């Protein structure tokens, strides 16, 4: 019989046992009294947004005061870790099958595997660049057609009167495109909504996000982002490219499509989480490279934002994929622009060249840049707080697909109405000189030979607007135009992010920052006697764009390199780095980064690089799950089926033990086996009795496990007869005989470092006699969080 004691149910921990209010209010719409308490307490808007650090001092009793050493528990209805997320197996299972396969492989076999990895990375880069090219061409053509139709209508309506028809036309066109994109996301593949960067960060961190790298997700993501950008929303197409690259990498590296049920019999060796993770890292980097024309920035993004494992060869392969991606995009866009071989469009967004002679900066301007970084951090924190509360509202009340589509169409209509109103009432007319490069200039009420400057920002794709703010001549925009645009676009972008559409936040952030950055440059020139010092406001637009984007997403290293590569001027590396560091420091003081906020709102058990501070006094004994369900090395089939069928626990890893004597002494650890392995063994009827009676039966190989990967069948789909339940199963050949273990007194930071660095899914806690006393999983470690009141413990519940 299995060594089965009381099985641990995550939802039965502590005070979570059957509470009538169990479950997250973010999902079921229940009240949050603690929020109203904070509001009435007169806190600042930034402190209100930090539900994870709610003030608990007024609730401490004398009994609780005696146990101040324990981590405080955040109230259940405010912060949760969801049980619906499982971990990925980033640790190789070195069982007998694995070792035999490695032993049989020759030197040439290993060389062929290494070559295959490079080939896959090249394919990932090529396909990512090709997808980016398709997105860019479709958006350019459809947006160009839309704006030309609207422009012709505005010209006719201006002459005849009645511009309301133009407003209605603009709003209707926006709504139609956005409706199509929102229906695809809300009704067919919700995981394709947003930029996808938080989901890919979680995947690379080791969290299994359902449906995140499926073919259907890619199709909806690509078509959806086309509709979102053409629909005029305050979004960008660059963020979703990272998700698209990751999906392409996950599909290509497996040599088959489970969605299409097509197996190409290629790259079968890579059908495991460890290999797939490395290729997804390459896909994410290729997506960044295609988006910004920044291959080095793509590598650093993959390292900074997600990769849980890194080595030198992986760095080279990821860089190779990034270079292939940007070259592919560059090459095909040169053909599209009828300039074959003119490789001047390395990314979806082209910032243009920032020539050192024209846009040079002086040493005494660096303090001004740092001050702009602080302003960007503050505005980024404000953006994140507002989006945080808006997301909570959406989770509570806008959770039906119909409502999600209606909201997206409402935002599209409001965006069109606001844009039209701002252009209509703007009196900022600029001369239409020979150097003017805008494709859709609007004259409206301006004199002949002039155009409406406000229309340059609103009546355009976001990428063109950013480039205009960077490189337009001084005097192109007046301060009022830039101020009004910054204010309106800030709130439009905040409202838009989180809709059920495929969209990114990179370009809106750059656009907002470029607008107020250019405004700062104009104001500096106006208040100084020597205007030549601040002659070009374009450099302040660049600094403002970096500050705003850094204040929202809180990336430093990778974003610095991305901006430097996109501008083509390495001399701006130092000020951009200082600006991004300042924006992150200031922003983190008020609120977390936007991606981290959305990860927490989804209750994902995300593990950061380091364990929470002040946690050294906690040990493995206090954080582990116990008692543990164990299996004997030779176990009864019926017992295994019963354990796997137990929906109250749904464990995925089982220590394998062996009895050293016939007395009641606890059994000793001899290995670890996963649920997925047991499923395959049951499916192939790998029973001791059948093996004896069928001497010519084919021996189970690793290929059988790889063929079942990644969608292992549920236990309910496997038929086991009553006679088969009485058979025995020998796990010796299939279990991992050398699982990682720690003593009970190991400190939490050491457990965390081992778990995080090695990409583990299960960590066995054993006593001095090597007997199993507990099991540490991702959720055990993610429960502990450092808040402003010290170490806090999150709740675990089925959401």
Q: Model segments located where?
A:
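Alpha-helical transmembrane segments and immediately membrane-proximal extracytoplasmic
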Residues: 2-662, 668-721, 727-736, 763-764, ...
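Structured, soluble regulatory/oligomerization domains located on the cytosolic or IMS-facing side
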Residues: 741, 746-760
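C-terminal intrinsically disordered, low-complexity extensions immediately downstream
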Residues: 754, 791, 797-799
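Short, glycine/charged-rich "phosphate-handling" switch motifs in NTP-dependent
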Residues: 775
